[in-house]
Swiss-Prot record:
This is Type III pantothenate kinase. Its EC number is 2.7.1.33. Homodimer. It is found in: Cytoplasm. Its main location: cytoplasm. It comes from Aquifex aeolicus (strain VF5). Coiled coil: none annotated. GO terms for cellular component: cytoplasm. GO terms for biological process: coenzyme A biosynthetic process. It is an enzyme of class 2 (transferase). Belongs to the type III pantothenate kinase family.
Length: 229
C-alpha cells in the first residue's frame, strides 16, 4: 500500500511517501516550493500548524485527511487543551508509541519546543524561538549584525562576529534544553528517554535519539484507524 504523510509547518511542508512500513521518499519543501510541485494521487494523512495553508495543501493533495488532536490516542493533562497544537499532541503520541511512557520530546524548527510525556500522559512543556528565527530576528533588529544560518557551534568563547552570534544563539538553545532536562529529572525523580525531531533537530542530536521522521511514523501507525478518522 502506497500513501503519504504530510506535516505542514510554519515555514515548510514535510512529505513522506510510504510503501507499507518503509519510507520510499521524503521531501522537505518551503511553502513556495510545495505549490510548484506535483504529487501522486494517493491517500494521505496530515497535521498542520498553519491552517491558512491547509487548503492549499488540499488543493495539491486532494485525498488528504487532516488529523485532529482527538485522533491521537494519548491522554492530555493540560490546563488549556483547546489552545494546544495538534503537532504537539501528535509528537507526544508518536514518542510514547515508539519510545515508552516517560519521554521528553524536543521539536526544533521555527519554534524550539520541549514537551514531557509522563506515565503515558502529555503534561506540557516549554516553547521558545527556534535557532534560525533567533538569528534572523537578531540580524533584522541589530544594525551591523549580518544574518547567519544555523550551525552547531561548540565554542567556549566567540572571537569573531560569526562565532559570537552563532555561538550565542546555539548556547542559549542548548542551555534551555539542558536546564529543562535537569529540572524535570529533579522534580519528577525519573530518567526520561529524550527524542529529538524537527528541521533543526540535527543540531541538538547530542541530547538523545534523533528521529527526523517521528511524527510521520506516528501518523503511519494511525493508518489502521483511517476509516474512523
Amino acid at each position: 500500500m502506497r500513501f503519504l504523510t504530510v506535516d505542514v509547518g510554519n515555514s515548510s511542508v514535510d512529505i513522506a511517501l510510504w510503501e507499507g512500513k518503509k519510507v520510499k521518499d521524503f521531501l522537505k519543501l518551503s511553502h513556495e516550493e510545495f505549490l510548484k510541485e506535483e504529487f501522486p494521487k494517493l491517500k494521505a494523512l496530515g497535521i498542520s500548524v498553519k491552517q491558512s495553508f491547509s487548503e492549499k495543501v488540499r488543493g495539491k493533495i486532494p485525498k488528504i485527511k487532516f488529523l485532529k488532536k482527538e485522533n491521537f490516542p494519548i491522554q492530555v493533562d493540560y490546563k488549556t487543551p483547546e489552545t494546544l497544537g495538534t503537532d504537539r499532541v501528535a509528537l507526544a503520541y508518536s514518542a510514547k508509541k515508539f519510545y515508552g511512557k516517560n519521554v521528553v520530546v524536543i521539536s526544533a524548527g521555527t519554534a524550539l519546543v520541549i514537551d514531557l510525556v509522563l506515565e503515558g500522559k502529555f503534561k506540557g512543556g516549554f516553547i521558545t524561538l527556534g535557532l534560525g528565527k533567533k538569528l534572523k530576528i537578531l540580524s533584522d533588529l541589530a544594525e551591523g549584525i549580518p544574518e547567519f544560518f544555523p550551525e552547531e557551534v561548540e565554542i567556549f568563547l566567540g572571537r569573531s562576529t560569526r562565532e559570537c552570534v552563532l555561538g550565542g544563539a546555539y548556547r542559549e538553545s542548548t542551555e534551555f534544553i539542558k536546564s529543562t532536562l535537569k529540572l524535570w529529572r529533579k522534580v519528577f525523580k525519573r530518567k526520561f528517554k529524550v527524542v529529538i525531531t524537527g528541521g533543526e533537530g540535527k543540531y541538538f542530536s547530542k541530547f538523545g535519539i534523533y528521529d527526523p521522521l517521528l511524527v510521520h511514523r506516528g501518523m503511519r501507525n494511525l493508518l489502521y484507524l483511517y476509516h474512523r478518522i
